[in-house]
Amino acid sequence: MTTTDTASETKPFQAEVAELLNLMVHSVYSETDIFLRELISNASDALDKLRYESIATPALMEAGGAPKIQIVPRKAPDTLTVIDNGIGMNRQELIDNLGTIAKSGTKSFLTKLTEAKDGAGLIGQFGVGFYAAFMVADNIVVTSRRAGSGEVWTWSSSGGAGFEIAPASEEAAARVVRGTEIVLHLKPDAAKYLEAYQIERIVSEYSDNIQFPIELVPEEGEPRQINSASALWQRSKSELTEEDYNQAYKQIAGAFDEPAMTLHYRAEGRQSYAVLLFAPATKPFDLFEPERKGRIKLYVRRVFITADADLLPPYLRFLRGVIDSEDLPLNLSREMLQNNPQLAQIRKAVTGKVIGELESLADKKPEDFARIWEAFGPVLKEGLYEDYERREKLLALARFTTTAGEKRTLSQYVEAMKENQTEIYYLVGDSIERLKSNPKLESATARGIEVLLLTDGVDAFWTSGQLDFGGKPLKSLSQGDVNFDLIPKLDADKPDDKPDETKADEATVIAVIKDALGERVSDVKASQRLTSSASCLVAGGFGPDRELEKMLARANKGAATKPVLEINLGHPLVAALADAKADKADATDLSFLLLEQAQILDGELPEDPAAFAGRLNRLVLRGLVAHG
């Protein structure tokens, strides 16, 4: 054979690969079947790549025969071999593809895999399924010839600290005319995978819809095809069963569960294309990784083009599946993918179909939709500020936890609104428990006004878009003024907690606090939000909500503006400020205490914790809090 380097070389695995291999070699996962599913999936990808590259270079297909995958079990010795005549790999590609993991989110993946009771689904999701073969093999030998190349290389490893890369032997080079041969030397407890019925069972369950022939090569007799080798998405819905779709989902998504939603249709007209999409029932571990993109595969006339074409908007990135176009050109470059008007039309139409299917599911199968919302609601809500065209539909689909204690739609909220209530109230925070104890809810709760409790990271952003639903604007209880005067309290006959004569004089108290706090706050106001707490902090009437301001400040994307301090004129602490006996030092301590306890209730620390503790001690010792 011809090669530029005839010497073998031992190389260490990348640290992340070594960690992953350690998990595989000492695997306690029960779903060891996935190793074969993953090897077949990789072989199918290699055949897809060959078919795509041969469009520009037809000579690549001249040697090696028609595309296929072969599985060869041999009991003496105990080896299982998976062969494809796909694109193959050269020396550097073997090193890069089998010795490193060039993916974002690797650290998060390994952490979750370590913690998982059964990591099979995670392995498939992350696309590192080759290493799953070490669950059943104590040594793996990979021989590969890249299509059109004269060089053949062998990669081998026992799953330890490294691997060996060397020119293939003459015998191996003669076997591998094009593509890749993977020989697994099975562990004693994995001998069952040499049985034909076990191989057929796994192929039937996970790989039947691989669109290339999968052949079982017995020790005696002729190879026989053991899969249907059809593009399921090109078949009519009437031909397919729920089980067919479940198997296709497991193959496409690398999953073990069943899909929460399936969308399959063919579009005809100005453009013709087939669509098969699945919504998983569980959340992928890397859903919020910054580099994560959509997982929809683009085919053109059954030729795989790319899985990186942004075929759906980012807020639908949890979907898995296939779009197969009859009209797009086969030679699509990355630039053409980004700017192709036909692809933009497909994206728009498919997005509309997905939203329509979610609406139908929410109406006809609310329990199935609830599973999707539970897993992917925070992602779908990204569309509320990304997709103006479909914002109203997405708002109607959204489910919210409220002070009523249940998941509600905005339609249900509006139906239950109090007489004279004109706004949809919400509060953003980091947990339901903390929101329920937030003092800004007090006046609304006293009137039986339902409030949306929003705790997803995206909530502070989409709510900043001045949205309305059914003509009712969404109103934050952390921003601007609120007016509940036209909505009576639930116990309307009960007098206010404090009669007017016991309330502090508004002008006097506000002047004292402003003088003490100076520029630490933008304003001091009497509150309509509070009934029992002394104070709270809110944002001004213009600009971002207070929670969004805090988030942006934590991310160093701008300093939070000075908040408005609202005070409860009926609270003893506030009334103490109006006491003529209070000297300036006491008034300053009380003013700062109102600000600092509001900061604590808002999830922040006082600017100077030591000073806060000092003034609190002074006030307690003087008895001002108890007797003011």
From Swiss-Prot:
Domain of life: Bacteria
Keywords: ATP-binding, Chaperone, Cytoplasm, Nucleotide-binding, Stress response
Signal peptide: none
Single GO molecular function: ATP binding
InterPro entries named among the record's database cross-references: HATPase_C_sf, HSP90_C, Hsp90_fam, Hsp90_N, Ribosomal_Su5_D2-typ_SF
ATP-binding is among the record's keywords: yes
Family designation: Belongs to the heat shock protein 90 family.
Protein name, as recorded: Chaperone protein HtpG
Annotated source species: Rhodopseudomonas palustris (strain BisB5)
Gene name of the record: htpG
